[in-house]
Amino acid sequence: MELQDKLLIAMPNLQDSYFSQSVIYICEHNEQGAMGLVLNQVTDLSIAELVAKLNFMMADGRHYPETYVFAGGPVSMDRGFILHTATERTFEHSYRVTDNLQLTTSEDVIETFGTPEAPEKYLVALGCATWTSGQLEKEIADNDWLVVPANNHILFDVPWAECWTAAQQLLGFQPANLVAEAGYC
């Protein structure tokens, strides 16, 4: 099962306090496990505030979105992850997720924010979600997650508070109508 570049939508019955009603973009999936970013939990920090805290002395005239930094997951919460559209510029620590999306963990991408070199679309997250080999596949088989193809509209344009509902609409049915457990006659 190939899960890279997919969205995980938490089933309504998922009771985990961190992942209940979450939407996660899977950035990497291989035989070692999976890594993703939660798209609908935010910190109380805006991108502009993050840039200031990182002590970047940016040139005047740069404008930063008032977008909040996402709480990308419970792992490595002190580490930044920037998911962005591909650019002509190469960043120090970038991973190609798709032909059009990259995940960067180096500060050099932040230095481009507010300039023509900046990615057209991006989101900034602190922390990520990870799964060991086979763990995510088991959670999917246990009906914890629904899987749909990702799209840039959900990733970058839908407000975080509406993400779970918007992602569910990609399914073509309401997950609340599903039964969480199979029955036998």
UniProtKB/Swiss-Prot annotation:
Cellular component GO terms held in the UniProt record: cytosol
Source domain of life: Bacteria
Alphabetical list of NCBIfam families matching this protein: PRK00228.1-1
PANTHER family in alphabetical order: UNCHARACTERIZED PROTEIN YQGE, UPF0301 PROTEIN YQGE
Assigned protein family: Belongs to the UPF0301 (AlgH) family.
Name the UniProt record assigns to this protein: UPF0301 protein MS0260
